[in-house]
Amino acid sequence: MWAGLFVACSVFVAFAILNVIHVYMRGLDSYESTLFGNLGMDGQRSMQIFGVWLAAALYWITTRAQRTEKEKASIYGLQHGRLHLQLPTAMWMNMGYWRNTPTSTTLSEACRDLLKAVLTEAGFLNDEGRIQRRIFLLDLGFGCGDQTIYLMSKEPIRACDKDWWDERDRCATFDHYIGITKDAVQARYASERVEELKQNEGSTISLFCADASKPTSWNEGLHTSIRQARVNSDERWILALDTAYHFSPSRWPLIEHVHSELEANYMAFDLCLSPTATWTQKTMLHLLTALMGAPWANFSTPQEYRSKLEQVGYMSEAINITDISEHVFAPLAAFLKEQDSRLKMLGLGIGRFGVAKTMFSWWGRTGVVRGVIVVAKK
């Protein structure tokens, strides 16, 4: 009904404007010196065409600006839901490990579970769920600080932390923690969170804004912190949780530095290329990786990944690569779809993450990309 009404109004307004202009121009006919002069038949035809185009433009504008009666009523009826959104909110961001259906798991819980899955594969938790060793952790890409809080705090710091916090005996803590992120905005946000943690307990935590993929670019302050942590620790680990495939020009300069200079173990959630990927799939993926800021050099098969770790110096028997793709891509795409629907009820949406939803759905459907947990011990 409303669409038809807007069409009629658009046409009426357009031709009304057309007639006003036409009458005005006719009034200028006697003035030959005027810029317009006598319109004539060609001029009248031009004015008619102009009117049609104006009507079409008005129709396009109104249809773009207006929704159906039902949709409009729904949005206006629920927009006050925005006023109930609680801030600050959890700021976890990785692909997550989805044990259950996406509708019964929050993103924060899935992100936490991906971290726990990596820690478990690395052997940090015994049957009682307690850490067996005192270690120094270098976290490459700590995001907005949620995983830092989870790894270093005995209890939730903010009220929003309680929504994803699990039993304390299932959480790992470390003696020394150094985090690196390239994102200055996230570094500032995470630093505020860590200051809140330090007020509660004297944790040995240092955060730096630097390019984790280029150890040669790290400043002296970062190098000094790492040296001090190494001296006061018996064991060293590097964590790259859903970050290493972004490292440019590739992840390997960093891993070589980790092995030779830091003499550290390596654990990560990373992406690999399926060994059965077709030429067409590889071509499409190559284009996508360029758009997502992930160098193509980082997309190797799991076997190639293992071989490269061996070339760096890790022993074959100390390398473990576990495929968890079925718990990552398809359920993440389903979650994003459901979240988009929920947010649209409030007149919002997931924005640019809609493109990511399509990509994750493709990965989950075809298996062209594999999500793996990588552990390499010295």
Each PLM stretch: what is its role?
Residues 14-86:
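N-terminal auxiliary segments of SAM/dcSAM-dependent transferases
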Residues 322-378:
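Conserved Class I S-adenosyl-L-methionine
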Residues 252-265:
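A short glycine-rich, Lys/Arg-flanked "PGG" loop and its adjoining helix->strand segment in the class I
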Residues 136-215:
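Class I SAM-dependent methyltransferase SAM/SAH-binding core
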Residues 236-250:
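A short SAM/SAH-binding and catalytic strip from SAM-dependent methyltransferases
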Residues 297-313:
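Short alpha-helix
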Residues 272-296:
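Short, glycine-/aromatic-enriched active-site segment of Class I SAM-dependent methyltransferases
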Residues 108-133, 150:
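Conserved alpha-helix/loop element of class I SAM-dependent methyltransferases that forms part
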